[in-house]
Design a protein with these regions (language model features):
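Structured secondary-structure scaffolds
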Residues: 1-46, 98-102, 168-400, 444-446
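Short, glycine-/Ser/Thr-/acidic-enriched flexible segments
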Residues: 10-11, 148-150, 177, 234, ...
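Beta-strand segments within the central parallel beta-sheet cores of soluble alpha/beta enzyme folds
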Residues: 317-321, 503-505, 581
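Helix-rich, typically C-terminal accessory recognition domains appended to large enzymatic cores
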Residues: 366, 374-412, 422-524, 614
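Beta-rich accessory regions
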Residues: 433-436, 448, 456, 483, ...
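Intrinsic disorder at enzyme termini
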Residues: 499-558
């Protein structure tokens, strides 16, 4: 059997945060590391998703080219993953020629089979930006849950897949203009043709996670609709049809093909260009996609349908999608910069402390919450005081009283045999949890073992028996060394850096997962070190304060639409000496805006002034008067000063 493991391709428009890690990456790495210890044929494939609207939006907001954006974040993401201990066999990019060729081949094969067809449709068009708007360039309210900030393809609040025309109060994400509906042509994937096959296939997946099956069956019950797979953009994989000039493949069609192109790249690096076919075309391949729950519909319905349409390819064996990880009671939000970014974390803390916390609190079946206080408690109480304490007390005792030579024993008492029996059963018991993607429970079993080990050490009192009965002391320390040796392997999938330190300290004799129930113990230990230093309250206080006093991202700032305006009329609001009601021309429209500038300006002197307006501010009533926008001003010691332009500018121009 071959095992092909993938993690969802991260968008190369920003760094990775803890929510991403907990969802699609850490669980996969644990699983792959375990399979390697079982000496199984497994490869782990990933890469950055470098096409799509998130990239072009970031580029426009940062005044850069899409290539500049993806080049930067590919390196940043790859380095962060490596520092976190991720062990991809290949980490590719969807902008590589190998991927473009594969994606176009996929399109052409499915098109020639009749599963892709053209269709003239209406699409939103921004008259100010002078272009058709891809779905993520449109924002508005979700028609299902009412959340603001829903995109034209999906609502992040309720995970509902949306169509742009379903949005309530749609606007252009870049300029805030209300878009128009215009006709254009796109190519559609005939997803509806695979409804029966998908139903039959899903019916065989009784072992999948309950929430994954529930989500998929819900979509199937509602009926599958054909999906557009092209976009009016220049950034992406060009559609390989003459009549589709100027269009690219939709990222949801393009991205999963990246799993194949990344595997091809891996095979070429191995010097065997056809090796990838042994994984993708073999019925003996077990293909597992690790994703977050927001990607279920793409990986469990659309992607399998694409593979069915092409033919020959293996279908996913399992899709153990995780639920969401929240942060201090709120959702992670990249747009609001409410997140703990992996590069920032790794500057302050060790990777294994986070790997432990995210696995211990993994959102495997329900949403969970990450808090800095929990992180500190788990690190100090469970890693330092439990695991680290047992390893340290065992090794330092041997080093101090046996000159680093590990005692041996051939006969054991009842308590010794009890611990050895726990060791003997550990590989199979923990392995079963990992095979079923129950990583949290697998880690829990290991930590129970370390608790038992500490109790064993305390009960046997080697500091006493060293003097009263040296043979019992030697036996105790021999058992302790067997435990430490086993832990150095059992912990490797979860805490690889810690496991590596332990192996170095005990001069580890190489052995696989199945052998560590009765491990070989090295005769002499090496230099020892404390595995985990405790984290002080002040360090955690600083991290908590960073979330409260966070900087906003360029994406978040980009949501504020600033435009030039010209004040046409102005008058004092009745009953107020400070509020002035202004009629402001913004391009072809006029807005009523109330500003608290009456102490510095007389109403009449404002008429004709060019001002800077926040155009997309939610309307509000001020002293009972509707205000639809905001005038920007500087708050100086001498009073408020309205901001204007250095040179004459027409109203309605975008301010960057």
């Amino acid at each position: 059997m071959k095992i092909l493991v993938t993690s969802a391709l991260p968008y190369a428009n920003g760094n990775i945060h803890l929510g991403h890690i907990a969802g699609a990456y850490l669980p996969a790495d644990i699983y792959v590391r375990y399979q390697r210890l079982k000496n199984r044929d497994v490869i782990y494939i990933c890469g950055t998703d470098e096409h799509g609207v998130p990239v072009t939006i970031s580029a426009e907001q940062q005044n850069k080219t899409p290539k500049e954006i993806v080049d930067h974040y590919y390196g940043s993401i790859k380095n962060s993953f490596e520092d976190f201990g991720m062990t991809f066999d290949n980490f590719s990019r969807t902008t590589l020629p190998i991927h473009h060729h594969m994606a176009q081949d996929f399109f052409s094969k499915i098109y020639n089979k009749g599963y892709i067809y053209p269709k003239e449709i209406k699409q939103y068009y921004c008259p100010r930006c002078n272009r058709f708007l891809p779905d993520r360039y449109i924002t508005g309210k979700c028609p299902r849950c009412g959340a603001d900030g829903a995109k034209g393809d999906q609502c992040d609040s309720c995970s509902r897949w949306l169509e742009p025309f379903e949005l309530v109060e749609p606007k252009c994400l870049i300029c805030g203009e209300v878009p128009q509906k215009r006709r254009t042509k796109h190519w559609y994937f005939k997803l509806s043709a695979f409804a029966d096959k998908l139903n039959e296939w899903i019916a065989t997946k009784t072992n999948w996670k309950e929430h994954v099956l529930s989500f998929v069956k819900g979509w199937l019950r509602e009926g599958l609709q054909d999906r557009p797979i092209t976009r009016d953009m220049s950034w992406g994989v060009p559609v390989p049809l003459e009549q589709a000039n100027g269009k690219v493949l939709y990222v949801w069609f393009d991205a999963p093909i990246g799993y194949i192109s990344s595997t091809i790249e891996w095979a070429e690096k191995k010097g065997d260009p056809d090796l990838w076919k042994e994984y993708w075309f073999s019925k003996d391949t077990k293909m597992i996609h690790f994703i977050g729950k927001d990607n279920i519909v793409f990986h469990a319905l659309i992607w399998p349908a694409m593979l069915m349409a092409y033919g020959d390819y293996v279908l996913p064996s399992d899709i153990p999608a995780n639920q969401f990880l929240n942060l201090e009671g709120d959702k992670f939000s990249t747009s609001k910069n409410y997140a703990i970014w992996l590069p920032d974390y790794l500057r302050d803390f060790k990777a294994d402390s986070l790997r432990y916390a995210l696995t211990r609190n993994a959102p495997e079946a329900r949403d969970t919450d990450f808090t800095w206080r929990d992180f500190q408690a788990w690190h100090n109480n469970e890693l330092a005081d439990n695991l680290g304490n047992f390893v340290n007390r065992s090794l330092t005792f041997i080093k101090k009283y046996y000159g680093s030579s590990v005692p041996t024993a051939s006969t054991f008492a009842e308590n010794d045999n009890r611990m050895l029996d726990i060791l003997h059963k550990a590989p199979a018991g923990i392995g079963e949890k990992l095979e079923q993607f129950e990583f949290k429970n697998g880690l829990r079993e290991i930590m129970k073992m370390t608790q038992e080990a500490n109790r064993y050490f305390d009960h046997e009192e080697p500091w006493v028996t060293r003097k009263t009965n040296p043979l019992i002391c030697e036996r105790t320390m021999y058992v302790c060394m067997k435990i430490v040796t086993s832990l150095s392997v059992l912990l490797e999938p979860f805490l690889p850096f810690t496991a590596a330190k332990m192996k170095k300290m005990i001069n580890f004799i190489p052995q696989q997962w199945d052998a560590i129930g009765a491990p070989d113990v090295a005769p002499i230990i090496g230099d020892t070190e404390i595995l985990f230093q405790k984290i002080d309250d002040k360090v955690i206080d600083l991290q908590v304060s960073k979330l409260k006093k966070r900087e906003i991202s360029i994406e978040e700032f980009g949501k504020v639409v600033l435009k030039t305006g010209k004040i046409l009329e102005a008058e004092i609001v009745e009953g107020s000496s400070n509020l002035i009601k202004c009629t402001v021309e913004i391009g072809d429209t006029q807005r009523q805006i109330v500003a608290g500038i009456g102490k510095e300006y007389k109403a009449q002197e404002l008429i004709g002034k060019t001002v800077i307006v926040v155009e997309n501010l939610k309307p509000a009533k001020v002293r009972g008067v509707l205000s639809n926008g905001m005038l920007l001003a500087a708050d100086t010691k001498e009073g408020i000063v309205l901001l204007t332009t250095d040179k004459p500018v027409a109203s309605g121009e975008i301010v960057r």
